[in-house]
Amino acid sequence: MRLAVVFGRRRYIGRRRTGVSPALTDTTAAPYRLRTDPTVYSVILAVSFCHFINDIMQSLLAAIYPMIKDDYGLDFWQIGLLTFTFQVTASLLQPLIGMYTDKRPLPYSLSFGMGSSLTGLLLLGFASHYWVLLVGAAFIGIGSAIFHPESSRVARLASGGRYGLAQSLFQVGGNTGQAIGPLLAAFIVVPRGQESVSWFAFAALVGMVVLWRVGMWYARNRIAAASRHGAGRELPFARNRIVLALVVLGILTFSKNVYMASLSSYYTFYVIEKFGVSIQDSQVLLFVLLGAAAIGTIIGGPLGDRFGARTVIWFSILGVLPFTLALPHVDLFWTAVLSAVIGLILASAFPAIVVFAQELLPGRVGMVAGIFFGFAFGMGGLGAAVLGIVADIRGIDYVYGICAFLPALGLLTVFLPDMKQARH
């Protein structure tokens, strides 16, 4: 490892004399070393597995909404408030945690974050009042806020320069967990009741052990990584152009996550109300949607490495528009098909968005991950709360009618800079 670091420095010094950008030389030295390290993929898969566990716990909250709505006599706005509590708790803390850990990495905080989510699960399982559900949702949000910035940094460190692939593998664990959550709710929680939610605390314990081991690997490797990337903090564009690009990425994240929040929070109610399916069948349909989103996440990162993040963002945000416009006007079969297509295409955007933002702000991996994961949670939570109020007033059909136009904001991708221009 020391030889690889020294070799990376020599390449950097030599190329600097020929006029090659320090940021580029820094990123070309690191991939060579990482690709020869057999432990890298085990680390990426470990954080992906824990992302899987983390997002199962998150998705259980939304998956039990139909059950607790009946048991507690909740209105749609109260369902939206649960989502809002979870996602806004995560969104407020993630950027702060990311900024702090950019300066002072906390390798073992990953295990602590999983413990917070475990606490939230236990509260959800044994809650007897609505306010306890809110506290449980907040603990799960805190766990996510701690988990995402540091685990995203670990995935990037272990990427070997294939940032899109690493981000996809990391995120697909979460998407798969979100997809399986409704099935677990349908076949375990719904038949056995609310207390069965607490059974999944055992999975959280496994995650804590795995993340402790990941933290040990991270603690050993972060010093060498800091020396490799310390010179690669030069901004690729003028500051005002970077600010504009980040604003555009934020708007695109808003459009994607508000629409996905409308699906994850209210899709089960939509198919129950419009097509008369059972609660269990609605959870299976939600699994189809979220499973397609998991596949989209796998596809998005490698496509970004191959064709560029900007191209993937163009396709994934704007390309989904015809399908969202058609969704409110089709029967049950085509609702299942179109929702799967929508989930697949939209989910392919987020790995590309995160990687693009990290390239705009080199050396700020944790902050960028915290902002965009946190912003995604926050916008999703705010969107769920607002859409819940709209659903109470105008009905679920109306919600999907107005949300269908959100992907049109993908036209703003035209304002994103071409990253190839930053390297010449």
Language model segments and positions:
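Structural signature of the two symmetry-related core transmembrane helices
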Residues: 108-123, 311-325, 404
